[in-house]
Amino acid sequence: MTPRTEGMKKISRIHFVGVGGAGMSGIAEVLLNLGYRVSGSDLQQNANTRRLAERGAVISIGHEARHVETVDVVVVSSAVEQSNVEIDAARTARIPVISRAEMLAELMRFRYGVAVAGTHGKTTTTSLTASILAEGGLDPTFVIGGRLNSVGANAQLGQGEYLVAEADESDASFLHLQPMIAVVTNIDQDHMGTYGNDFGRLKDAFVEFLHHVPFYGAAVLCAEDPGVRDILPRLSKPYRTYGEREGVDIRAVGIQRLGLQSRFSVLRQGAEPLEITLNLPGYHNILNALAAIGVATELGVADAVIQRALAGFRGIGRRFQINACLNFGDGEITFVDDYGHHPSELAATLDSARNAWPDRRLVVVFQPHRYTRTRDLFEDFVQVLSRVDVLILLEVYSAGEAPIAGADGRSLSRAIRVRGQIDPIFAETPEEVFDILPNVLKPGDVVMTLGAGSVGVLAQQLPERLGSEAVP
């Protein structure tokens, strides 16, 4: 067992409010494996809460003040309102209430921390980095926002010195972290309410995050992203750049996109070209792999280890996850599930699908996530969703937000219809999708469920339901 940090010796019982989230459950599992007594609450069960309960955590469904009566510290998800009864009770009892990132920072403080930030690609880049280190026998601890298929979990306590984790900019909590290596995959307009709807303030936060890296550490930055390029002149800490353009430190050349894989060579100063086969589709994942290669190069991982890890990478849950292939008429239907919920993510995922299956129709079931995001990026959603062949649009998954007029699923559906490229089908509830799909599917279709909300549950059910009901 890894020793507890000196300050944390005073702590025995740790309670998580909103424990079912990927980031929260991951930290809870690491602390559980370190020997702490972990409890948590959430509004509903999911795979994360069940996994924690199986490993000895005390999980409660629903929030009550009594859940925090005997704990030493309360860790709160950014998705939980500050008026939550458990938070109120903890403060009344003078129990420390901290953010997820504060607890992650404590775990990182006594390890060699690698923090992966960026609007898009954090989970995949963190997973690729952790997989390379594991392949090299470095046994890292990792906390990831999705399930790493090779271990069947989103977190693992390793015995090595490295801790690899996502750094969340959505609530600016990544500013708690003090990593040795920081990665920034991109800087895009999302969660803008945190930054007063000022893109400049968002970029300022990333600069501050990168300045938390010590002078003997390093940053690994994507030079293909305009937001990242904007901040480069402001950085005073060591950094490496990656991308496809000339002049970057870690450069991909000779890119071949081969269906669900990619091949390319990596050029690095003072090193032989590195031939890579990446077991992931999409140009965006080539960039994510370059980031992981940049970290591995900084840590001195052998090239052969990098090659094995990327060629054998088994993917992440809900990141271009192929759930099933079913016989359908004289062809088949392929079911793909992806967490993408921002227009840039949707565009990258759809591009990957078009490249993998250029002659097949894309039937997309999309659930918008948050009314504020739908409002702020409305026209971008209209543009990217108009490119698919068939669109079934669900109502917005609120994530606790109040509805906003003109930013709901029906409004988005109408705007896409007015654009004139496709005629979307609006589904009031996920259950309606089971009735709609059999009437629109054709042999050879690729069904893609996209979004960060409950559409992930629908994605798990579709192959079985349609396999028994929809074959013509």
UniProtKB/Swiss-Prot annotation:
Keyword Cell division in record: yes
Gene3D superfamilies: Mur ligase, C-terminal domain, Mur-like, catalytic domain, NAD(P)-binding Rossmann-like Domain
EC supergroup of this enzyme: ligase
Location of the protein in the cell: Cytoplasm
Pfam families the record matches: Mur_ligase (PF01225), Mur_ligase_C (PF02875), Mur_ligase_M (PF08245)
GO biological process: cell division; cell wall organization; peptidoglycan biosynthetic process; regulation of cell shape
InterPro entries registered for this protein in UniProt: Mur-like_cat_sf, Mur_ligase_C, Mur_ligase_C_dom_sf, Mur_ligase_cen, Mur_ligase_N, MurCDEF_pg_biosynth, UDP-N-AcMur_Ala_ligase_MurC
EC assignment: 6.3.2.8
Gene Ontology cellular component list: cytoplasm
Protein name, as recorded: UDP-N-acetylmuramate--L-alanine ligase
Lineage: Bacteria, Pseudomonadati, Pseudomonadota, Gammaproteobacteria, Methylococcales
Gene assigned in the entry: murC
